[in-house]
Amino acid sequence: MSLLAQLDQKIAANGGLIVSCQPVPDSPLDKPEIVAAMALAAEQAGAVAIRIEGVANLQATRAVVSVPIIGIVKRDLEDSPVRITAYIEDVDALAQAGADIIAIDGTDRPRPVPVETLLARIHHHGLLAMTDCSTPEDGLACQKLGAEIIGTTLSGYTTPETPEEPDLALVKTLSDAGCRVIAEGRYNTPAQAADAMRHGAWAVTVGSAITRLEHICQWYNTVMKKAVL
């Protein structure tokens, strides 16, 4: 049975939650062994897959979880706004570390390596390709190039202002066009994640609301301060 078929079964049985275990950079939690522990806890709680940034974190996580891992490498480049898995060597390193799915930036922005080249390299390793997109045009273009999974990850992050709510319209548009969509980006409540599934998402990735303790504390503190001022 193919990995996609296995995931289809798991999603049907468990609801399609993917947990992104990416601590705040330089956080006390930003250690491979802690990332792996969070991933294992997420798997035991019913996550159908895990999203991991960085080769060391992926290696540590691969050693303890059996669910599929979506691997990425983030870089801050001087000559490109693209941050997610921008180079062939990133794809190779993630494949060697044990990723099952490799996600890349799928936006139509200046980049060091074309999307189609990165997709070909992912498929060379026999892995599934996911593209993190920001618009319907991005997603449909990546689908035509052969990406098996389209993520709404970058919706709201390629424009001057980022909305507070997730982009359900993008989920529906891509799903209606026949894309296998992972809804991602600002899904901070179970209700929002369920709404994404109702809009046609194949699965939903949740990060900050589960694994970024600093963000969660800040949300509480912001609201609680308003209550006493």
Curated annotation (Swiss-Prot):
Keywords recorded for this protein, A-Z: Carbohydrate metabolism, Isomerase
Catalytic activity: an N-acyl-D-glucosamine 6-phosphate = an N-acyl-D-mannosamine 6-phosphate
Matches recorded under Pfam families: NanE (PF04131)
CDD domains according to UniProt: NanE
Gene3D superfamilies hit by this protein: Aldolase class I
This enzyme's EC code(s): 5.1.3.9
Protein name as it appears in the record: Putative N-acetylmannosamine-6-phosphate 2-epimerase
Gene expressing this chain: nanE
Superkingdom classification of source: Bacteria
Residue stretches spanning the membrane: none
InterPro entries per UniProt: Aldolase_TIM, NanE, RibuloseP-bd_barrel
GO cellular component terms, A-Z: cytosol
GO BP annotations, alphabetical order: carbohydrate metabolic process; N-acetylmannosamine catabolic process; N-acetylneuraminate catabolic process
Lineage per the UniProt record: Bacteria, Pseudomonadati, Pseudomonadota, Gammaproteobacteria, Enterobacterales
KW Cytoplasm (keyword) present: no
Function: Converts N-acetylmannosamine-6-phosphate (ManNAc-6-P) to N-acetylglucosamine-6-phosphate (GlcNAc-6-P).
Presence of keyword Nucleotide-binding: no
UniProt pathway: Amino-sugar metabolism; N-acetylneuraminate degradation; D-fructose 6-phosphate from N-acetylneuraminate: step 3/5
Family (UniProt): Belongs to the NanE family.
GO molecular function: N-acylglucosamine-6-phosphate 2-epimerase activity
